[in-house]
Amino acid sequence: YPTLSWGMALHLSQTTLNRDHDRTDPAGYDSRLGNSLSFYGKFSRPVVRWGRWSAGYTLSFGVAWHDKKYHPHTNIDDVLIGSRWTMYYSSGLYMGFRFLKEWTLKAGVAYFHHSNGALNRPNKGSNNIGPTLALAWTPAEEAIEERGRKFTSPPFHRYFYATVLLGIGGKTFDSDWRRTQYTVGKDNPDYLTTRFHVSPVYEFQTAFMYRYARRWASGIGIDAEYLDLSGTSGDIARYDRWSVGLAAQHEVFYGHLSLRM
């Protein structure tokens, strides 16, 4: 059975960043990535159980606060984090061993991502992969398992369905940022500017799905995006405005919740 939970994670980092070799006017110091505190909700599901052992996966989504971010004068090369608050995502695999009736030791590996959080920085973010170790206390383990053995679900009928999604957003361009960050000198009014032209983006997604099991549905769809380049010039004005592609989609259901990939 899956579990839903919430939690906090403290990420400590001593990472330094320096791009003085790329600059017309070197900064003369090392920037720091800094530390972060993440608040998240987690979906965890054991896929395999044998005796006291189990193996499964976790998915986490939330927000994070950072003690350092990009600053043109004090942290110029931290282009990974552009805002105090960013989006947080994590996914991982684990193996667990229940050494006592209510206690389980879990070890695994996980991927952690903090978004950049700003339109005036490259869309990079901070990415980490590392080991995980957890001690889980489940005082209601036996009661939950007994309830699961007695539970009978209503009949499930397979069916087809279609989805349509519309979206609008904004884009700035990496070429604009790189020019003002590395190429122009301090005498240029665009030097280290944080103001860039934002181009609207219009998105359309549709998919035809088949729900073949209570927990899963799969299908194929079309993704289309239109980039409004009015007000731009130079190489940017020559970018393709349309992007169209086919997308294989999979949706996982749990009660009234679902996650689409």
What positions do the PLM features span?
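Repeated loop/turn-to-beta-strand initiation elements of outer-membrane beta-barrel proteins
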Residues: 51-53, 97-105, 141-145, 214-218, ...
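Residues on the lipid-exposed face of transmembrane beta-strands in outer-membrane beta-barrel proteins
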Residues: 1, 39-45, 59-63, 91-97, ...
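Transmembrane beta-strands of outer-membrane beta-barrel pores
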Residues: 10-16, 61-67, 111-117, 137-139, ...
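Transmembrane beta-strands of outer-membrane beta-barrel proteins
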Residues: 2-8, 55-59, 105-107, 131-133, ...
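Predominantly the C-terminal beta-signal and adjacent terminal strand-loop region
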Residues: 91-159, 171-177
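Outer-membrane beta-barrel translocator domains and adjoining extracellular loop/strand segments
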Residues: 16-24, 67-76, 117-124, 147-149, ...
